[in-house]
């Protein structure tokens, strides 16, 4: 760990080269941007995903050690994933708990309990299942990082997206608890709260919400942007930059934090 200021921009994000990193849901969206960014900075990356198509395409776009099909909500898939991590990387320095789904859109009296459970299982329980396997490896490495994806919906209640918001609030509690538990082992644990991420998922959410309230897709998009101080959606690479910072030596004393990368979402 450096005790002086960096001499140049090139020296700022040190400590990433050679890091062994697992990125869940890393073959598309935010996960792809994270894997791409960390790989370019010299990290050795394993990704998992549920999409065969995305997994097949990712290695031609990113320098990956391995791409593994796994559903993080399934114990047996997570066990198999970490067997691959140990075999391919020989250990682990960082876990990026990125996997998640949008979950159902609807009033609490309209949501199917199976859809509720599926959202919680992937967005929250999956982070637990991965962390419980990652922690012994990161301890054995002498310390490292866990970065988990929450959401602006983990800071603001989100009407008609109750399962998703509940899961993302849970991620923050999980993160703060792990930070206290793992700090003595030199493991930093932080949550990132992305805002409205550009891409097909939010387009689907906006369409569903617009249909519910009886307005056009364009008008609903404008309403979403009106609640963001910077009046812009968030790029997956905005989030990836924060992950790189947290995993680098620049983030050596940051733990237990919930960091918004959202253009300052004022409300949802």
Regions found by a protein language model. Name each.
Residues 2-13, 102-105, 156, 232, ...:
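Short C-terminal tail/terminal secondary-structure segment
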Residues 4, 191, 199, 215-254, ...:
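C-terminal helical subdomain
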Residues 27-28:
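Conserved glycine-rich cofactor-binding loop
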Residues 106-108, 112-120, 224:
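Substrate-binding pocket helix/loop in short-chain dehydrogenase/reductase
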Residues 131, 167, 175:
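Active-site helix of classical SDR
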Residues 151:
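Residue(s) in the substrate-gating loop at a strand-loop-helix junction
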Residues 183, 188, 254-256:
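Short, small/polar-rich loop/turn modules that mediate ligand/substrate recognition or access, typified
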């Amino acid at each position: 760990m450096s005790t002086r200021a960096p001499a140049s921009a090139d020296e700022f994000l040190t400590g990433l080269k050679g890091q062994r990193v697992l990125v869940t849901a890393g073959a598309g969206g935010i996960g792809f941007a994270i894997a791409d960014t960390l790989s370019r900075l010299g990290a050795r990356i394993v990704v998992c995903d549920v999409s065969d198509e995305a997994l097949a395409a990712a290695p031609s776009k990113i320098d990956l050690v391995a791409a593994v099909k796994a559903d993080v909500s399934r114990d047996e898939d997570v066990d198999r994933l970490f067997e691959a991590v140990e075999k391919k990387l020989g250990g682990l320095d960082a876990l990026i708990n990125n996997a998640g789904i949008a979950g159902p859109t609807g009033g609490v009296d309209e949501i199917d309990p199976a859809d509720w459970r599926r959202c919680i299982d992937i967005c929250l329980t999956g982070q637990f299942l991965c962390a419980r396997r990652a922690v012994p490896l990161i301890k054995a490495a002498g310390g490292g990082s866990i970065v988990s994806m929450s959401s602006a919906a983990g800071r603001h209640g989100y009407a008609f997206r109750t399962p998703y918001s509940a899961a993302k609030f849970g991620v923050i509690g999980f993160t703060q608890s792990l930070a206290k538990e793992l700090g003595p082992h030199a493991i930093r644990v932080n949550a990132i709260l992305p805002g409205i991420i550009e891409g097909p998922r939010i387009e689907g959410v906006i369409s569903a919400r617009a249909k519910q309230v009886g307005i056009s897709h364009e008008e609903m998009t404008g309403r979403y942007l009106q609640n963001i101080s910077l009046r812009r959606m968030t790029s997956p690479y905005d989030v990836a930059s924060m992950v790189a910072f947290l995993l680098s030596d620049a983030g050596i004393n940051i733990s237990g934090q919930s960091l918004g990368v959202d253009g300052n979402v004022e409300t949802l």
